Regions:
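A contiguous loop/helix-start segment that scaffolds small-molecule binding in enzyme catalytic cores
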Residues: 91-154
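Class I S-adenosyl-L-methionine
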Residues: 1-48, 135-139, 147-148, 152-153
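Generic beta-sheet signal
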Residues: 20-24, 77, 95-100
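General beta-strand structural signal in soluble alpha/beta enzymes
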Residues: 24-26, 52-55, 99, 124
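Alpha-helical scaffold segments in soluble metabolic enzymes
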Residues: 11-14, 61, 65, 89, ...
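Electropositive phosphate-/nucleotide-binding environments in soluble metabolic enzymes
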Residues: 2-9, 33, 56, 84, ...
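Generic secondary-structure signature for well-ordered alpha-helical cores
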Residues: 10, 14-17, 49, 68-71, ...
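Class I SAM-dependent methyltransferase SAM-binding "motif I" and its flanking Rossmann-like core
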Residues: 31-93, 140
Length: 154
């Protein structure tokens, strides 16, 4: 991936050196788990000015598509980019957990969530904001990369 980030940064800086304005379009918000950050660091480290304009995060888009709120009052919202061994401990402290890129590890996620004795509602969204967006109850098992699962503990 580093070669792609370096290539993108090189292309952008070439255009900037030509006096052009350049935009980097990304899905979601550029400050949250985005390729933008890797490219922007490379450009900024070369002395160029980088402006970041916020977008709608994919996980808040997913919540809106599912018609659910992520947090109210003093609820703790956990947002993680993937399923791994750290998640079990983190879930204990969350009132709502948002787990991104879940389809490849949905069985592990389901096992971890089911270990928690609290009542819960599980909603998954795949390809949020796209023409083939899907929202459904339960865990994402269809293998789509842009899968997010939201767990609301009660």
């Amino acid at each position: 991936l580093k070669s792609y980030w370096n290539g993108a940064a090189q292309l952008i800086t070439q255009k900037l050196d030509e006096g052009l304005d350049v935009s980097f379009i990304t899905l979601g918000d550029p400050s949250i788990y985005s390729t933008f950050s890797y490219v922007a660091h490379r450009i900024g480290n070369q002395g160029y000015c980088v402006e970041m304009i916020p977008g709608i995060t994919s996980f808040t888009g997913c919540a809106a598509s599912a018609g659910i709120t992520l947090g109210e009052k003093d609820e703790i919202i956990l947002v993680v980019p993937k399923v791994d061994e750290r998640l079990e401990e983190l879930l204990k402290h969350a009132d709502t957990a948002v787990v991104m890129k879940t389809s490849r590890h949905s069985l592990m996620l389901e096992e971890l969530v089911c270990k928690d004795p609290r009542d819960k509602k599980v909603v998954s969204v795949q390809n949020c904001g796209m023409d083939d967006e899907e929202v459904f109850e339960g865990f994402a098992k269809k293998g789509k990369y842009l899968s997010t699962t939201i767990v609301k503990f009660k």
